A protein has these predicted regions:
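Bacterial N-terminal signal peptides
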Residues: 6-16
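Eukaryotic scaffold repeat domains enriched in small/polar residues
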Residues: 23-362
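Positively charged n-region of N-terminal signal peptides that target proteins for export
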Residues: 1-4
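Cleavable N-terminal signal peptides
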Residues: 11, 21-22
Length: 362
């Protein structure tokens, strides 16, 4: 009898242990929301392509970095040289078209992200040209990081140094490809102005630069362990300089300090493709679960506390309003106002959330 009781107790304990992961997957409440119909007003005969990047500045202006086609291709030696496959548009806070920035810029090839820093400078990340470019608020190029392949073979440079418009390049900081991007994906800044780039599709790492764009360090490699990545795709930094990296190939968000030391990870957010973080004394994290190849019906966006607790979700995959066609970019400067850039539907939606007030709301 004692043996039987012991066996039953062991089975019960095993069942409880096996149930723990499932118990952690609590139901996520739906957040009511609306989508402003046709918010962005495009001029006649100008169209958005894949809305790879979306960002807002302190005035509420919206910037969209979009894959519009029309690229120029030059074959030279063993390399293919391409440019002008993307465009950067600006809209005012009402959605009215303002201008195109950087028309036919050498760096514009295959758009991946646009972000606006605390000084309202506009930064684009281009996966095709392997370049990160900074524009001032007037739309003039003031910095580019990395070097684009030439159309003909040339010797590798001794260093990949940033170049500021109107001034000399920064001092050499290293040699060879170690300092070169390979299909970068996103950019963020800490409180000191240090620059962080997810060097994602090719190198599976995060690179850190000082505020003058001088290389500081890199961390990460291809893999599944903490601190490794499978296509780091989006990056944001909170007011305490914690660094959040979307790691969609590993179905997680990883959190680091600003020196690259791993702190924790969130694994209950599907396939996180895009992140944004709100301003203010109480910050929130938004993450898009964007069309996991194993479940194309996924497509919702999560609202989270910075400790990983999910407050709710909204939307689903689809082509109608309030549905999402592979969200590739998020902006949430205002807590319950989210801009979502979509790939398959060629659009940006302005989303207004109506969450119930909770004890964590401030």
């Amino acid at each position: 009898m004692k043996r039987l009781c012991g066996l039953l107790l062991l089975v019960a304990l095993c069942c409880v242990g096996a149930a723990r992961p499932a118990a952690a997957q609590v139901s996520v409440p739906e957040i009511p929301f609306d989508s402003a119909p046709d918010f962005l007003k495009m001029p006649q005969d100008i169209y958005l392509g894949e809305a790879a990047g979306v960002a807002t500045n302190s005035k509420g202006h919206i910037f969209v970095y979009t894959r519009t086609g029309g690229s120029t291709v030059t074959l030279g030696g063993s390399r293919t040289f391409m440019h002008s496959g993307s465009q950067l548009f600006e809209f005012d806070q009402t959605g009215k078209y303002v201008r195109e920035i950087g028309k036919d810029l050498y760096a514009f090839n295959f758009a991946h992200a646009v972000r606006v820093d605390s000084h309202d400078n506009i930064w684009i990340v281009d996966e095709g040209s392997d370049l990160v470019v900074e524009f001032n608020p007037e739309g003039r190029v003031i910095l580019n990081v990395n070097r684009k392949d030439e159309a003909v073979p040339v010797p590798a440079p001794p260093a990949i140094a940033p170049v500021r418009s109107g001034g000399p390049a920064a001092p050499p900081v290293g040699t060879g490809a170690q300092y070169a991007f390979n299909k970068p994906t996103d950019i963020a800044w800490d409180a000191a102005g240090n620059i962080f780039v997810t060097d994602g599709h090719g190198n599976s790492r995060v690179t850190k630069y000082d505020k003058e764009a001088r290389f500081v360090k890199a961390w990460g490699s291809k893999g599944t362990a903490p601190g490794q990545f499978n296509t780091p795709h989006s990056i944001v930094i909170d007011a305490q300089d914690n660094v959040y990296v979307a790691d969609p190939g590993n179905n997680r968000i990883q959190v680091f300090d600003d020196n690259g030391t791993f702190k924790t990870q969130y694994i209950n957010v599907g396939t996180p493709q895009a992140l944004c973080i709100t301003a203010g004394p109480h910050q929130y994290l938004y993450s898009s679960n964007s069309n996991d190849p194993g479940n194309m019906e996924n497509g919702e966006i999560y609202k989270m506390e910075l400790d990983g607790r999910i407050l709710g979700k909204f939307g689903r995959a689809g082509t109608l309003m309030k549905e999402f066609g592979a969200v590739h970019a998020l902006d949430c400067r205002v807590e319950n106002e989210v801009f979502a850039g979509e790939i398959t539907t060629w659009r940006v939606q302005k989303l207004i959330l109506h969450p119930p007030r909770t004890s964590s709301s401030r």
